[in-house]
């Protein structure tokens, strides 16, 4: 039986996002009452049009053209032209998982009922997701200041029967992809192009998948760290609960508890419990709970922010059917990607720290000046064989230290570059997983950005 989830704009989790992104058989549907809520929002838009109100992006142009009025008989043309003009991304296509995450998130935030879009348009987006019609979305072209306009426009193109889509591994014109899936393209009405392309779902979708990968990297780092401690004949005494209670950060306590569990009944530890002249281990061994725990704390906060973003209305203007006698249409700035960009900076730092301390443990394992009784570079035949001499150097190059400086502050006009940062973290996370496990990124989500 395929999995099924229901969306309502309020309760989507990161685990739901990963499931839909990585398992194309998962079916997504509206929760009861969701379509009625969207319809009420749409009725506010229709009422504003009937009354001749001036509404940004509905009866006016966009951006610098916001003061330009649009004739009533050209309102639909305005919306389709918006999608066509803004679908100008470049670079390799987003991965299938990233695309599916983005589609799910866009449908979910529209399901909140604050965007003034007809339910049938969002249903068609879900139909595409369920049928495996995946818009081809270039990775590059968004700076996050007004949301992810270019990527979301590429998504919307297929919805209207244009652009390109991947279906079953084959890239097709959007109209043909929809035809093969038995889906009718939609014709956008007033407000609907803007509702589809104004938001943060590109960076938030990638960020959600990267976070799930990072959570696995932490788990792998603790397994690798416990094995390193055994190999170096270290002691888990520094992980004692009393030490953790003296500095009660939740992540630190969780890491220490897991390390104690991994090292419980270790025969290697018992072999040198008595008569060992060493007083304490090196930082990279002794401080694992503090460093890994800081990463755990960071990931918990990032999860909270990304789950909030996954259930947030991020377009402009927003429609509030329950405000005032006839509802309100209000221009705001929920499209700005700074909340996501900021936590993605934190994710980059956390992953880089995990990779860095892991690389230092690798150095201690292979360096004959640091590795105690272990053979130089972990080879039985040093000289003829170099062992893991260069593996440590390679690990050093994979720590991400050269590409993790903050991206959220890189522009004085408040573009946050969160989308570019999400792409960089894909590299950082893959490198961190390689450093921690030596297994070609097996611990990470993998492929959150490019195929």
What residues fall within each predicted segment?
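N- or domain-start disorder-to-order transition segments that initiate the globular core
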Residues: 1-52
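Glycine-/small-residue-rich beta-strand-loop submotif within the FAD-binding core of flavoenzymes
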Residues: 11-24, 68-98, 127, 131, ...
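FAD-binding core of FAD-dependent oxidoreductases
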Residues: 56-70, 74-78, 85-108, 136-160, ...
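A structural-propensity feature for long, helix-poor, extended segments
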Residues: 86-116, 174-208, 278, 370-436
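FAD-binding glycine-rich core of flavoenzymes that anchor FAD
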Residues: 114-140
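Glycine-rich anion/phosphate-binding loop at the beta-strand->alpha-helix junction
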Residues: 145-155, 160, 298, 302, ...
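Mobile "lid/hinge" segments at catalytic clefts and subdomain interfaces of large enzymes
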Residues: 151-260, 264, 405-416, 431-441, ...
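Accessory "access/gating" subregions that flank catalytic or transport cores
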Residues: 229-356, 372
């Amino acid at each position: 039986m395929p999995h099924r989830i229901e969306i309502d704009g309020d309760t989507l989790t990161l685990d739901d996002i990963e499931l839909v992104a990585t398992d194309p058989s998962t079916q997504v549907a509206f929760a009861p009452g969701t379509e009625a809520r969207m319809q009420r929002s749409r009725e506010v838009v229709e009422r504003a049009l009937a009354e001749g109100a001036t509404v940004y992006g509905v009866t006016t142009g966009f951006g610098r053209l916001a003061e330009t009025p649009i004739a009533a008989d050209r309102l639909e043309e305005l919306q389709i032209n918006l999608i066509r003009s803004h679908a100008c991304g470049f670079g390799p296509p987003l991965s299938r998982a990233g695309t599916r995450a983005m589609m799910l998130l866009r449908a979910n935030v529209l399901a909140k009922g604050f965007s003034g879009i007809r339910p049938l348009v969002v249903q068609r987006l879900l139909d595409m997701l369920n049928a495996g019609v995946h818009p081809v979305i270039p990775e590059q072209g968004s700076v996050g200041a007004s949301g992810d306009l270019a990527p979301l426009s590429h998504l919307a193109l297929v919805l209207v029967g244009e652009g390109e889509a991947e279906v079953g591994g084959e890239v097709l014109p959007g109209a043909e992809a929809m035809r093969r899936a038995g889906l009718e393209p939609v014709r956008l009405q007033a407000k609907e192009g803007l509702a589809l392309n104004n938001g943060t779902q590109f960076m938030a979708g990638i960020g959600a998948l990267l976070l799930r990968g990072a959570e696995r990297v932490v788990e792998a780092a603790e397994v690798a760290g416990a094995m390193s401690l055994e190999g170096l004949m270290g002691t888990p005494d520094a992980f004692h609960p009393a030490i953790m209670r003296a500095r009660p950060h939740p992540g630190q306590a969780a890491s220490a508890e897991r390390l104690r569990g991994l090292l419980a009944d270790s025969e290697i530890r018992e072999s040198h419990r008595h008569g060992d002249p060493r007083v304490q281990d090196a930082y990279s061994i002794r401080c694992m709970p503090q460093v890994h725990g800081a990463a755990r704390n960071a990931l918990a906060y990032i999860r909270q922010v990304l789950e909030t973003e996954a259930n947030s209305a991020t377009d402009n203007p927003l429609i509030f059917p329950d405000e005032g006698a006839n509802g309100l249409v209000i221009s705001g700035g929920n499209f700005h990607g700074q909340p996501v960009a900021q936590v993605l900076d934190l994710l980059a730092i956390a992953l880089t720290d995990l990779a860095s301390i892991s690389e230092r443990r690798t150095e201690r394992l292979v360096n004959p000046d640091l590795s105690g009784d272990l053979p130089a570079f972990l080879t039985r035949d040093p000289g003829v064989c170099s062992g893991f001499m260069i593996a440590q150097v390679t690990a050093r190059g994979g720590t991400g230290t050269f590409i993790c400086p903050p991206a959220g502050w890189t522009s004085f006009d408040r573009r946050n570059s969160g989308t570019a940062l999400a792409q960089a973290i894909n590299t950082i996370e893959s490198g961190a997983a390689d450093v921690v496990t030596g297994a070609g990124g097996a611990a990470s989500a993998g492929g959150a950005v490019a195929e």
